[in-house]
């Protein structure tokens, strides 16, 4: 099984070829190809390569499928025995990316 651990916008993701993942919003158009260069680890059928901090010879190709919004998160602040209440919601902007290829040079 071939997989890689990639850093995108400060977070690390375990990715495999042929699957799609939701990342924080990437400001590009739908259907465009993207290249992920910050590969931290690669497992190529049992052969493990670890970067220091990144692997220069490995790139991950992906395609942007859609831009979407995540589930709503509610934040509710309240002070007991007072009439102070504050309810606030947040929906994270996401980009769904299909991983097409993990390529080693």
Curated annotation (Swiss-Prot):
Keywords: Chloroplast, Plastid, Ribonucleoprotein, Ribosomal protein, RNA-binding, rRNA-binding. Transmembrane segments: none annotated. One of its GO terms (cellular component) is chloroplast. Pfam families: Ribosomal_L21p (PF00829). It comes from the Eukaryota. InterPro entries: bL21-like, bL21-like_sf, Ribosomal_bL21, Ribosomal_bL21_CS. PROSITE patterns: RIBOSOMAL_L21. Its main location: plastid. Belongs to the bacterial ribosomal protein bL21 family. Part of the 50S ribosomal subunit. This is Large ribosomal subunit protein bL21c.
